[in-house]
Amino acid sequence: MTQLHFDNRLRQQLPGYQEEGARRREVRAAWSAVMPTPVAAPYLIAHSAEMAHVLGLDASEVASAAFAQVFGGNALYPGMQPWAVNYGGHQFGHWAGQLGDGRAISLGEAIGIDGGRYELQLKGAGPTPYSRGADGRAVLRSSIREFLCSESMHHLGVPTTRALSLVGTGDAVVRDMFYDGRPQREPGAIVCRVAPSFIRFGNFELPSARGDNALLRQWVDFTIARDFPELVGTAEALYADWFAQVCQRTAVMVAHWMRVGFVHGVMNTDNMSILGLTIDYGPYGWVDDYDPDWTPNTTDAQGRRYRFGTQPQVAYWNLGRLAQAVAPLFADQAPLQQGLNRFRDTYLACDRRDTAAKLGLAECRDEDLELIDALRALMRDAEMDMTLTFRGLIDLSPVHPDPAQLHDAFYDDHKRVASASQLQEWLQRYAARLQQDALSPDERRALMRLANPRYVLRNYLAQQAIDQAEQGDPSGVQELLEVMRRPYDDQSGRAAFAARRPEWARDRAGCSMLSCSS
């Protein structure tokens, strides 16, 4: 039997409801005890060997029937004390009231072999007191997407929650994928998500909205003590340092999203991690042909609130809602504005750093921001693939820049021909800038390879793996996981995983637009 060590500080140190199973319309506590609902026949589809190692789980344990039972929701390891957390949130700009973990159940806080804290959370393990009448289950397609994206983002260097395992349940789940009145039975699955903390902005918003300043203060004090132990001080000064840290981490996270072309799709405040981690992988996507107005979320198709280009502004707005929530703990609101300013300053610094790295420059001058903006405008107008364009610049000659280097980045031959002179003009500007730069050609290429991935988890790649898995073949999931472990390396025999989106996937469900149905 695996001997994981759990201390479960959240459950021990914050007020909650101990009795299991009851569904409540309104919960005035931080958490509620709840047991996963057993499934028919749990079986392991895929797992992260790296995450298992950090937790101290060896290969034989992961391959055991007991592992599938535990992470399929049918059993517990000693020390696990399952709970679901209570929170609220702003959804699409409007206060939604109490939400909570509707289908996420935390098993416990494990201490890894590295001394780190790892909360293990099952998504899709059945109803909780916060399910609001839903079944608390998840389908295979959404579970595959969450599992793969969690690990892919980690290896891209983007702050993120992780995934330990993907377990099939042997049960069917009924879902209306596009909310069009045509529900279908789909295979069920459960992902075990892993993070130092799953605390969200909404954990602070809910007690604040209810005027429960005592619980609000408990949440803040607990979060600082457990998750920000490096912060020292007392009273408002400590709270101000903490809020500024949250703002800074959020800025770093979003800057990475913009660097790799990731679109979260549903940046509600209940989907914002207090640690600045990417959390809740639902209708996400990667930008294929560059379009700052693109969103993968069908629910957001009309308003496009969460489109790619507005993600930094949305993050700032969300931090403003967090500032409002914790304002009762401050006599003076100035420290909160200073924290919001930290977000702005950090994001701008990250943007300059990433601009230099993506273009292979020793430093980012003001005119370099204009240079990359001109490239983005060209990519948008000429329908060029973001990932392939930046990757294609790596081997460009600063002496004789050849537009053919970017041939594969175009989705439309007519637009490629029409934009040829603009592209040549931009390449000449870029080549001239490279000749002024202090980096050697080898240094430039090395820098660019670490900033511009060769492989990203394009929606069509994930959908192909889903199609296979739904037919009983998990090999596509496992191969994608392996490819995405080294996203910056040129991998022999895997050129197909770096190809631009094929035409058949342009408008196919799951490849272009996705819903929140999962």
UniProtKB/Swiss-Prot annotation:
Annotated Mg(2+) binding sites: N271, D280
Name by which UniProt lists this protein: Protein nucleotidyltransferase YdiU
Lineage of the organism: Bacteria, Pseudomonadati, Pseudomonadota, Gammaproteobacteria, Lysobacterales
Top enzyme class: transferase
NCBIfam families reported for this sequence: PRK00029.1
Catalytic residues in the record: D270 (proton acceptor)
Entry's family note: Belongs to the SELO family.
Catalysed reaction, written as an equation: L-seryl-[protein] + ATP = 3-O-(5'-adenylyl)-L-seryl-[protein] + diphosphate; L-threonyl-[protein] + ATP = 3-O-(5'-adenylyl)-L-threonyl-[protein] + diphosphate; L-tyrosyl-[protein] + ATP = O-(5'-adenylyl)-L-tyrosyl-[protein] + diphosphate; L-histidyl-[protein] + UTP = N(tele)-(5'-uridylyl)-L-histidyl-[protein] + diphosphate
Source organism per UniProt: Xanthomonas oryzae pv. oryzae (strain PXO99A)
Cofactor (UniProt): Mg(2+); Mn(2+)
Keyword Coiled coil: no
Signal peptide: none
The keyword Cytoplasm is assigned to this record: no
MF annotations from Gene Ontology: AMPylase activity; ATP binding; magnesium ion binding
Positions annotated to bind ATP: G100, G102, R103, K123, D135, G136, R193, R200, D280
E.C. no: 2.7.7.-, 2.7.7.108
Keywords: ATP-binding, Magnesium, Manganese, Metal-binding, Nucleotide-binding, Nucleotidyltransferase, Transferase
Function of the molecule: Nucleotidyltransferase involved in the post-translational modification of proteins. It can catalyze the addition of adenosine monophosphate (AMP) or uridine monophosphate (UMP) to a protein, resulting in modifications known as AMPylation and UMPylation.
S-S bridge residues: none
